[in-house]
Amino acid sequence: MALFLIIEPDEDIRRLYAAVVRGLGHEAAFFDRLPIAKPDVVLVEPADSNSLAAALRLQHDNPNLPIVCASVDKPTHEEAQVLRATTYLLKPFSLVELTDALQLALSQRSN
């Protein structure tokens, strides 16, 4: 079972993401309740500067940490280079697209 850390400012969207992660048989945690254990995958809304900063701190500590970005804004070239996300999802997206992105990120984690 993997731990997915959700960094998303909208509470309703956080809950939806958590339900999808749990439906895949994994654990979901929110950044405001950061667990002691290190996450296996991060799901982040990079358009929110606080969320982006948090993801960058986590990635600094673990450069191979898979990151899935889900945003209403298409990333700039600079943002894409800085964050090195496994995948970007443009909102709105389907649950199938979200599930596929999460599974791809999970397959790319370092063990």
Give the location of each predicted region.
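C-terminal output helix
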Residues: 93-103
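Alpha-helical interaction/dimerization surfaces of two-component signaling modules
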Residues: 19-23, 57, 79
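Alpha4 helix (beta4-alpha4-beta5 surface) of REC/receiver domains from two-component response regulators
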Residues: 69-89
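Conserved hydrophobic packing residues within short motifs/helices of P-loop NTPase cores
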Residues: 5, 66-68
